[in-house]
Amino acid sequence: MSAVSESMNRRMTLGLLASRYGFDLDPTSAAEVTITSIADDVESVRPGALFVPSADVDVHQLSQAQEQGAYGAIVPHALRGQTDDIQIPLIYAEPTMGQLGKLVRDMAGNPSDALAVFAITGKNREIVESEVRNLADFLHMLGNPVGVISSSDSQSLERFLNLEYPLSAIDVQRIMAVCAEDGAAAVILALDEETLREDALQSVSVDVLACDDNGLSDAEVAKLVAKFGCAVGKQTRIAGRTQESDLLAAQAATAYGQTDSRSLSLSIAMVLAAGVRKANIKSALRVSRDLN
């Protein structure tokens, strides 16, 4: 069940939507109809929603969406001529995942621009989930309120989020908007198939991307996350453990009496890639050690 509604920051008219993406609005007189949320399944439709089915749609589903208060729906051109009994405005289009991602992002207020977005991937799901938790703890130690998106434990600051996995692009934008509204400075994503559907990160700007396998090249890491719609752009930093992060982590692990510093090293490498000063990291580690 996916709907962008709890954290909608913007509204959009059907006319603007159709003109922006080159879609066909029927009737054209519905151009000023304003949608207030987006839903990709019938169960998620609320009054004012735009129904954007994630799978093949039929007239029966459109009728259900209409009954539940949808203000419009995006449907394929193949349905033209079969919807005479549908009274809500229809937008005929075959939108790409990129277009849908931009639409959902715009409706949610582009939350990834208000957050430092960290993402961790790898071939071992359990390790990825562990790295996400460790990074969340480390960012919290540095004084950053954090949101986490992970099938094992999603939360916005201290608020646990009851979600159905894997998450769609609509879900991800909604959760990130919730985190931003709650005051999070950063959000951490677990890039695994249990957490995310394909293309779930369309139009999400990832600032720092890391992999639990330090032997992969940047190109291999980018290929690994492409199925989730995670585009590695010029602003994306791909982080991995370095001699510097290993040394800082080893020093901290010794102080704590721990034997494994690999996970802490990756967390340190990621926050260094995000622009946090080494002096600040050392200070936080020292304070944490003294408190413990």
Predicted segments, located by residue:
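N-terminal leader/targeting and accessory segments in enzymes
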Residues: 1-102, 106, 250-261, 276-292
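Phosphate-binding loop of NTP-binding sites
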Residues: 104-257, 264-274, 278, 282-292
